[in-house]
């Protein structure tokens, strides 16, 4: 698909004389770099907080209890995402369109009211009909309280999206990387030692963590936006807003669902303990996935502002730049977590080591998915319906492939861990195809190729694999303490020298700031 657009190969920006360097791309790239850099530190905080939770959940609660928790979690978060009506990315466009016309707080409160209404109705439904949450039929009234997380999750998405529109990524980091993960880790440990709450400890800890994150987001939101002025519900306008948001909300749910449908299908074909093992592998693999979401809040506002001026060259440049940043960082982290995978999974508990194969394929899936994610960040604004159909086709293909591979494992009488690996392979293939199709579509719409792949990633991976193979000869604790940093160092040294040019290194220059806040 050619070289990724950069200031040196995309030509002059429309509206500027030929040969005149564009004035704004540096500011936009700096804004993207600043937001991504802030959230990258948030990723490191997530890593530090996620591991204690997995350790507590695996060692204290066990794989079967984790599987039961994961089944409920899938439904709760999917429904909450639908109830947020795609505001995680759609709010930026509504705020941009309303500039100078409506008070921004009023725009946000339209979404908050709708999300509250839909999420409360959903919570009531699942309280009365809990079977989808607990397919095993094992639950009590304390477990059912997890439905109260649906409104909290949906509202958190909206207030954090509002802050991101003002380039305030630090609030997202505080809520998602500090408050939520540390709250669930601490409370899961506390509830385990309270006999009456022990069996529902994971569900209750999750519920508390969601509202702790919401409180963090609301504090910053009210300070920066304030209370609405002259706002009142407008049923007709909100009905139009709901209809308009459906494609985006569905696309969000499908994109999220591609990383959860595997758990649902495993629950139908595998034992609860196998689902719990896969959930742990997925949680470890989702750590590099957070690097993609690091750029989503800031990429949306930047793209919408360039769409207003129809500056497609700059959009292509930004998508490719962010795509390479994500791919390069994810590949390094995937190697660091995947090569010593047995030690990583063994940290949670000896019964989880069987999920090492699934972990490897899940980490690879996150790397190949980077192109799809950054392409979709633009497609939701320029080809919303076509993007939706591609997403639907992706999850349908993944579901069919997952079931087919699991049945193949059964046919050859392989043990349960192979079913988890089969689900991970299906995810990797589906996300890879989605990346290819979405990049081609976006390139045709913008009139410029979209390709964030560079062979330097392969050259950097080679020494990292060699180092990783060496550290697997060490004791497990040494693999984790010394091996992971050594792999990252080997990979980072090569990718910095061979893969990163001046534009790429903006991500690591703290003295570069966007022109406009």
Predicted regions and their residues:
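Membrane-interface junctions at transmembrane-helix termini in multi-pass inner-membrane proteins
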Residues: 152-176, 360-394, 441-446
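Membrane-interface helix-loop junctions in multi-pass transport and translocation proteins
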Residues: 58-66, 143-144, 166-171, 182-215, ...
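Transmembrane helical elements of multi-pass membrane transporters/channels
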Residues: 34-51, 205-225, 234-305, 325, ...
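Membrane-proximal transmembrane or re-entrant/amphipathic helices at the cytosolic face
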Residues: 2-26, 454, 467-517
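Helix-loop junctions and terminal segments of transmembrane helices
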Residues: 84-99, 164-165, 281-323, 376-381
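Interhelical loop/hinge segments that connect adjacent transmembrane helices in multipass membrane
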Residues: 11-32, 195-205, 216-259, 298, ...
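Signature of the first transmembrane helix
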Residues: 3-17, 28-88, 123, 149, ...
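Hydrophobic transmembrane helix module of multi-pass membrane transport proteins
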Residues: 4, 8, 13, 113-254, ...
């Amino acid at each position: 698909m050619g070289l990724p657009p950069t200031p040196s190969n995309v030509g002059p920006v429309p509206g500027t004389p030929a040969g005149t360097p564009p004035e704004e791309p540096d500011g936009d790239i700096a804004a993207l770099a600043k937001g991504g850099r802030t959230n990258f530190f948030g990723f490191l905080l997530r890593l530090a907080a996620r591991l204690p939770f997995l350790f507590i959940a695996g060692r204290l609660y066990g794989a079967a209890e984790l599987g039961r928790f994961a089944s409920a979690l899938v439904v709760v978060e999917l429904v909450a995402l639908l109830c947020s009506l795609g505001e995680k990315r759609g709010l930026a466009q509504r705020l941009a369109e309303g500039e100078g016309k409506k008070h921004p707080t009023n725009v946000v409160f339209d979404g908050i009211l709708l999300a509250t209404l839909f999420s409360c109705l959903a919570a009531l439904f699942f309280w009365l009909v809990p079977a989808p949450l607990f397919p095993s039929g094992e639950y009590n009234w304390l477990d059912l309280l997890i439905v109260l997380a649906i409104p909290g999750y949906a509202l958190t998405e909206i207030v954090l999206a509002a802050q991101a529109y003002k380039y305030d990524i630090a609030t997202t980091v505080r809520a998602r990387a500090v408050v939520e993960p540390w709250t669930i880790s601490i409370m899961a440990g506390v509830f385990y030692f309270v006999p009456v709450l022990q069996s529902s400890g994971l569900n209750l800890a999750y519920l508390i963590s969601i509202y702790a994150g919401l409180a963090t987001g609301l504090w910053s939101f009210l300070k920066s936006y304030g209370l609405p002025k002259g706002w009142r519900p407008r049923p007709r306008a909100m009905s139009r807003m709901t209809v308009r948001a459906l494609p985006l909300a569905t696309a969000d749910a499908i994109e999220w669902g591609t990383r959860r449908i595997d758990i649902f299908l495993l629950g139908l074909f595998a034992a609860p303990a196998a689902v719990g093992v896969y959930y742990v592998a997925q949680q470890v693999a989702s750590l590099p996935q957070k690097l993609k979401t690091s750029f989503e809040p800031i990429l949306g506002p930047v793209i919408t502002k360039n769409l207003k001026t129809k500056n497609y060259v700059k959009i292509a440049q930004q998508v490719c730049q962010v795509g390479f940043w994500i791919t390069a960082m994810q590949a390094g982290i995937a190697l660091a977590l995947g090569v010593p995978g047995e030690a990583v999974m063994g940290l949670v508990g000896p019964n989880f080591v069987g999920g090492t194969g699934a972990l490897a394929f899940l980490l690879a899936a996150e790397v190949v998915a980077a192109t799809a994610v950054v392409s979709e960040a633009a497609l939701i604004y320029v080809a919303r319906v076509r993007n939706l159909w591609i997403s639907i086709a992706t999850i349908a293909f993944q579901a069919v492939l997952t079931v087919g591979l699991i049945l193949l494992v059964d046919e050859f009488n392989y043990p349960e861990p192979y079913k988890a690996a089969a689900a991970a392979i299906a995810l990797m293939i589906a996300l890879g195809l989605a990346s290819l199709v979405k990049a081609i579509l976006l390139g045709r719409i913008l009139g410029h190729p979209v390709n964030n792949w560079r062979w330097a990633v392969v050259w950097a991976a080679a020494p990292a694999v060699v180092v990783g193979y060496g550290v697997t000869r060490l004791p497990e604790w040494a693999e984790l303490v010394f091996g992971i940093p050594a792999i990252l160092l080997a990979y980072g040294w090569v990718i910095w020298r061979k893969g990163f040019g001046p534009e790429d290194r903006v991500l690591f220059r703290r003295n570069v700031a966007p022109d406009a806040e």
